[in-house]
């Protein structure tokens, strides 16, 4: 009769079985923790009470019950020596007993966990997607099987444009170079499922003679599969179409620095903490570090998208030494020309200061004398200009050090006034005065 009633009873569902197993597992884990605490408590109590008892008995025996015979004293000392050994033996027994209990508890816990894992695998095989997902989220949240169930949804097919050839490339041809997955047991069905579910996303529309066009972006999981190690995380989809660019002007330093590199950076004072990062303006990739002094004046080409990033500022350039010497010569020539122009009006004023009576009494002889005087003045002016040109040529040939080494005051006194200061036309003024006196 009991067998018939047992057959008529309905079997418990998987959720009920898992709930019961979850409760048993929790109780076993609590018992294990409690057993560990009890072992520590009992061992500590044993040591505490045994030491107190040992001290009290030794004091009482020594003060009141110390025997007088030699054999009795030896027996009492032997008992006092055996008491610590007895306590140590009791401690080992307690530890063995509690360890045996924990081993039995752990065995039962492992059996329950194995049964639970087996039931969850059956749920993955037999139950529907929705029910299996609910059960796994409730009883096994840390499992990776939930991610296996979340397959990507295939996107709509791409319609070709008129006048263009549709090139269909299967996902298997594109993902030949994909590396093996991390989980070997679960990687092959996942990759095959993704490849079978996303054939439409791998289509490209391209016209003959034109660049390929991509209108649909792949799913994140397919991106994860197609991404190779070493490629930047912020790569643009159209960057794969660009041809490889020129090589970099400078090598990119590795991120991981060794102990020797750190010591050298500390001694020299040149490390990542003293540099600025070179970030590409287009793909925002890291292209190494630059010094603080050179950061604003550095122009670089990105190592990933080959975009030329211009410098933030232009470096100021110092003028050349030849230009400085030419500027000095120009200033000197300008000052000398102004002095010459002042001399000529002075001579004209002296001639015009003659009285009108003398101008009326001019004879042909006086006109000839004036013409001779004018020729003499012109010759003097030309000689002064030649001397000034020679001085300028000597100044241009000499270096700046020769200019700094000026002659002594005694030598300046011995030299004539025209050579010491060529800008002062003293002889010309004296000769013009003498000629004016002769005409008078």
UniProtKB/Swiss-Prot annotation:
Cytoplasmic side: 1-45, 99-440
Record's keyword annotation contains Electron transport: no
Residues bearing the modification Phosphothreonine: 159, 198, 219
Gene Ontology biological process terms in this record: endoplasmic reticulum tubular network maintenance; endoplasmic reticulum tubular network organization; positive regulation of endoplasmic reticulum tubular network organization
Assigned GO CC terms: endoplasmic reticulum membrane; endoplasmic reticulum tubular network; endoplasmic reticulum tubular network membrane
Endpoints of the signal sequence: none
Keyword flag NADP: no
InterPro entries registered for this protein in UniProt: Lnp, Lunapark_Znf
PTM per Swiss-Prot/TrEMBL: Phosphorylated. Phosphorylation at Thr-159 and Ser-325 occurs during interphase. Phosphorylation at Ser-177, Ser-179, Ser-188, Ser-192, Thr-198, Ser-206, Ser-215, Thr-219, Ser-222 and Ser-231 occurs during mitosis; these phosphorylations reduce both its homodimerization and the ER three-way tubular junction formation.
Location within or outside the cell: Endoplasmic reticulum membrane
Zinc finger extent (C4-type): 280-305
Residue stretches in coiled coil: 16-40, 100-128
Modified residues (Phosphoserine): 177, 179, 188, 192, 206, 215, 222, 231, 325
Swiss-Prot/TrEMBL keywords: Coiled coil, Endoplasmic reticulum, Membrane, Metal-binding, Phosphoprotein, Transmembrane, Transmembrane helix, Zinc, Zinc-finger
Main location: endoplasmic reticulum
Topology versus the membrane: Multi-pass membrane protein
UniProt comment concerning the protein's domains: The transmembrane domain 1 and 2 function as a signal-anchor and stop-transfer sequence, respectively, generating a double-spanning integral membrane protein with a N- and C-terminal cytoplasmic orientation. Transmembrane domain 1 and 2 are probably sufficient to mediate membrane translocation and topology formation in a N-myristoylation-independent manner. Transmembrane domain 2 is sufficient to block the protein secretion pathway. The two coiled-coil domains are necessary for its endoplasmic reticulum (ER) three-way tubular junction localization.
Function of the protein: Endoplasmic reticulum (ER)-shaping membrane protein that plays a role in determining ER morphology. Involved in the stabilization of nascent three-way ER tubular junctions within the ER network. May also play a role as a curvature-stabilizing protein within three-way ER tubular junction network.
Record's protein name: Endoplasmic reticulum junction formation protein lunapark
């Amino acid at each position: 009769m009991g067998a018939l009633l047992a057959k008529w009873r309905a079997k418990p569902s998987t959720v009920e079985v898992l709930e019961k197993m979850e409760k048993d597992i929790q109780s076993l884990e609590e018992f294990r923790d409690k057993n560990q605490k009890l072992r520590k408590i009992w061992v500590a109590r044993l040591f505490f009470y045994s030491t107190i008892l040992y001290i009290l008995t030794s004091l009482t025996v020594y003060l009141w019950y110390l025997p007088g015979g030699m054999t009795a004293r030896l027996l009492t000392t032997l008992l006092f020596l055996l008491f610590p050994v007895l306590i140590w033996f009791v401690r080992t027994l307690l530890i063995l007993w509690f360890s045996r209990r924990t081993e039995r508890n752990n065995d039962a816990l492992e059996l329950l966990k194995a049964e639970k894992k087996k039931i969850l695998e059956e749920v993955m095989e037999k139950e529907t997607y929705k029910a299996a997902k609910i059960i796994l989220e409730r009883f096994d949240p840390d499992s990776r099987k939930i991610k296996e169930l979340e397959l990507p949804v295939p996107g709509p097919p791409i319609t070709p444009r008129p006048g263009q050839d549709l090139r269909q490339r299967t996902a298997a041809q594109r993902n030949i170079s994909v590396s093996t997955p991390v989980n070997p047991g679960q990687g092959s069905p996942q990759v095959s499922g993704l490849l079978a579910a996303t054939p439409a996303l791998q289509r490209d529309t391209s016209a003959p003679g034109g660049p390929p066009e991509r209108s649909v972006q792949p799913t994140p999981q397919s991106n994860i599969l197609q991404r190779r190690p070493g490629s930047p995380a912020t790569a643009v989809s159209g960057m794969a179409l660009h041809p490889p660019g020129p090589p970099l002007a400078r090598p990119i330093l590795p991120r991981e620095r060794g102990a020797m590199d750190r010591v050298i950076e500390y001694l020299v004072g040149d490390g990542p903490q003293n540099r600025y990062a070179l970030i590409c303006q287009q793909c925002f990739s890291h292209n190494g570090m630059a010094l603080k002094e050179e950061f604003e004046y550095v122009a670089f080409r990105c190592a990933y998208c080959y975009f030329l990033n211009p410098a933030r500022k232009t470096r100021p350039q110092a003028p050349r030494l030849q230009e400085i010497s030419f500027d000095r010569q120009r200033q000197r020539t300008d000052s000398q020309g102004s002095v010459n122009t002042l001399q000529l009006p002075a001579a004209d004023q002296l001639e015009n200061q003659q009285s009108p009576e003398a101008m009326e009494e001019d004879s042909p002889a006086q006109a000839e004398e004036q013409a001779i005087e004018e020729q003499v003045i012109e010759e003097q002016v030309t000689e002064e200009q030649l001397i000034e040109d020679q001085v300028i040529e000597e100044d241009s040939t000499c270096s700046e050090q020769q200019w700094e080494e000026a002659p002594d005051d005694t030598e300046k006194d011995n030299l004539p006034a025209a050579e010491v200061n060529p800008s002062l036309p003293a002889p010309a003024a004296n000769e013009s005065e003498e000629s004016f006196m002769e005409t008078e």
